[in-house]
Amino acid sequence: MTARMISIYGLVLASMMASVWASSSRFQRLPQSQSVVENESVKFECESTDSYSELHYDWLHNGHRIAYDKRVHQIGSNLHIEAARRTEDVGSYVCIATNLASGAREASPPAKLSVIYLESASVQLLGSNRNELLLKCHVEGASGDSEPLEIEWYRNSEKLSTWKNVQLDQHRLIIRQPGSDDDGLYRCTASNAAGRVMSKQGYAYQSSVKCLPRLARRKNQKMMESWDKQTFLCRGKRGGAAGLEALPAAPEDLRIVQGPVGQSIIKEGEPTALTCLYELPDELKNQRIQLRWRKDGKLLRQVELGGSAPITGHSFDSGKDALLREDARLVLHKQNGTLSFASIIASDAGQYQCQLQLEGHLPISSTPGVLEVIEQLKFVPQPTSKNLELDAVVAKVHCKAQGTPTPQVQWVRDGENSTLPDQVEVDANGTLIFRNVNSEHRGNYTCLASNTQGQINATVAINVVVTPKFSVPPVGPIETSEQGTVVMHCQAIGDPKPTIQWDKDLKYLSENNTDRERFRFLENGTLEIRNVQVEDEGSYGCTIGNSAGLKREDVQLVVKTTGDGFAPEESGGDGFLVTRAVLITMTVALAYIVLVVGLMLWCRYRRQARKARLNDLSTKEAGGDQPDAAGNGKGSEQEPCLSKQHNGHSKSRSKSSGDAQKSDDTACSQQSRASKKSAHIYEQLALPRSGLSELIQIGRGEFGDVFVGKLKATLVTSPTDKDADTEKQHSNSENGSGGSGSGSTTLSTLNEKRRSKTSMDDIEEIKEEEQEQHNQSALEQLVLVKALNKVKDEQACQEFRRQLDLLRAISHKGVVRLFGLCREKDPHYMVLEYTDWGDLKQFLLATAGKVNTATAGSSSPPPLTTSQVLAVAYQIARGMDAIYRARFTHRDLATRNCVISSEFIVKVSYPALCKDKYSREYHKHRNTLLPIRWLAPECIQEDEYTTKSDIFAYGVVVWELFNQATKLPHEELTNEQVVQRSQAGSLEWSVAEATPDSLREILLSCWVSNPKERPSFSQLGAALSKAMQSVEK
């Protein structure tokens, strides 16, 4: 009872003191609410503006006076808490300033402290029946207001998202109508600023019916080619389901001769192979037998061994594993069972085991082998320079390194092996800690990380700064009489020396925009106003600032007018003058209102007439009715990310918009027309989501997931090939702009284009008309679907619009088509053309024998010949030339972003699977994932993308083609080394060995540092055409 009374008394005392001292002083710095991770330091600042009296500061925690110790202590007026604890330090903090001379007190508003922590997570079953499975992720932890707790669900190792019968609702997972496809172990992860934890024990769900299907067939009856069209009989035992424990053992002559070695130690980046030699009897060669490799108990790779059994790519065990992902590094050889790695990474470490399973029998497993990876020595992340506040109690600079064995981290100053300055130490984790920061701590500090692999270093610059403070703040309000003199003081201290800027009513004041005879700006920051006028009255602000921050104080100036100022008008008694002034003012105001109303009505009439004219033209062009403006407006409101046209390259392409631009409309009408045109464009691209089917996720891109699916053929419009028109316009523009040049130059350019066009027609194996007939006869079109998951990310939305405008503006057989846009609900889908053979990089790896594509009785496809490689390069150059003529840039040209069909037609596309499948080919630079090994130096240094930077990337693409995409450019260098050498201009390029001699010079010119010296795509196309003709001869 006594403790409660004391707590209530403390809160009442704090609230009363907030109004005691308001007239004599106020706070210059108030304590701010904070959220920190547990065991981190906290600092509450508190400072009063009363610099003329002696003040004493106290702190209250939840209404109680704080008992200070080594962990919680007060320095000056500020409160410092070392290693914040959630059990003791959470709550509200109030600063109390006491004037020792008068005894007056003032209390600051309470500041809240929240401690972020994360201990454990567990899966709880809330309900389970035939219609619904309901799970909850219970988390022991807390998050701040700015960063809520993030929950992710996994089935086995597969990350779940809201899809079909799966719904994610905050901490709960709801599966409606669960079936056999939903069997597995469900686990959840929780993450916040304190870290990430996964539930130790998950929930294993198993549907009620579980048995192995068996196919009944007569003797000497051949297996049908399609397994999915057979009828399976599933019989379970009475009283329970049949499981693997009821299966018989495999025949003894089916066995594994040699499994993986007991323990293998491999360096990161080196190749290796795991052995699994097996014996397969002749009488079992026609049976369905699977060879599987497991990592840490989870299925990694599998292949069918039976000679006549079809290769379905699916396992006939009940488990679902997320480790069955596409990875070009891993190859499972069917002949000898060997699992080979092209290059080892740190995540490959684990326990490996191979298995043989005959259908309907227990699997045969080898002895497990352990693969250990010697991780490369590197910084994670790279240490960065930092500004430290002078007199700060504790400041930290982190330096974390990874490698095998664990590296030792140490710090040196100014590149010397001398000891660190006083009050500077290094903790066990390699963090550099500064205590009681002073000016002697300035300098360059180098972090050294070393182990048996060697030593790496990183240098950071430490600068000590002082936050600007008011030594003499402006005090107000100030009252003065007209024609008087006012002096407003404003002096500041800080390091670097702060600058002082005055403003009046939020408008900056300087000697250039004020009366120099009346306004004087003194060197110490004081503002003096002589001969004060009535218009000088207002709010004056003084802002001080340096590299450590900004501060501001306001003061109100009140100008009192003398009684003589209004005496002549009042004593004159001439009311007619006043009446006349009022009448004139009202007449002018009324005329202005009438003018504005008239203009509004006139603009409205013009807009309606123009709208009717545009609708008539749109109806004639489309051959049918178009959605009205109201519908377009509604669509724009549903998608704020696509409500405006942001690409400056898009032009008016219709006759109606061209006529509208030539009209004498006002600026307001032009903006309205542009907005309606943008909405009309996106409405034309609209596709119903119901038209998509069989969506399969193949990876993740920069703004969301990427799928491959099918689109109804009825929703696919016939393509409009603008290649000929674009070439004609380009030729005319070159002739018009090149009037000052020689006629021979123009003639040679036209000849090159004719040769380029003729060569392209020669290598086309399928006519365009035949392709159109094939598309019309097909019931479904294979498409690539890019989802916009990050709707609130402005950068992701901008990139989504850029790609949308790029593919919408181009209609060329060398560039994939944009079929439409699904905007009915989130996430929005961009639907692009896709091919039956997929991306070009996987095709090159398959022809090089790096991807196992062989089926029973067939062999891997042969490598590409030189003429075929030149044909692929020529088609890519034609597609990129179309992008250049449309005044766009690609920014991510590579073989992974091109597609190829079974008719050997190559198109430029934009899958950009930078998050998982091709994550090794991207590097995070300036908080953006970039393909640094394909980028020109100006893109990395200045973030400047032009057609010349696409030509630089095209040279790398040709290098990939002649190397069959079996290795990365400059794979001997790390990503950081590539960035450093590219910025320094020391990254050297060389063409592939198989490159024809006639192309070496022009390909090397693609990589020159000066963009103006690089060739154009038309010149590259002409050179490739000549090379193809010479190879054919």
Curated annotation (Swiss-Prot):
Principal subcellular localization: membrane
Disulfide-linked positions: 46-95, 137-188, 276-354, 399-447, 490-542
Ranges of residues in domain Protein kinase: 692-1028
Top-level taxonomic group: Eukaryota
Cytoplasmic side: 603-1033
Entry-linked InterPro entries: Ig-like_dom (IPR007110), Ig-like_dom_sf (IPR036179), Ig-like_fold (IPR013783), Ig_I-set (IPR013098), Ig_sub (IPR003599), Ig_sub2 (IPR003598), Kinase-like_dom_sf (IPR011009), Prot_kinase_dom (IPR000719)
Function, in words: Acts as a calcium-dependent, homophilic cell adhesion molecule that regulates neural recognition during the development of the nervous system. Component of the repulsive Plexin signaling response to regulate motor axon guidance at the embryonic stage. Also component of a receptor complex that is required in the adult visual system to innervate the lamina layer; specific targeting of R1-R6 axons.
Protein's name according to its UniProt entry: Tyrosine-protein kinase-like otk
Protein's gene: otk
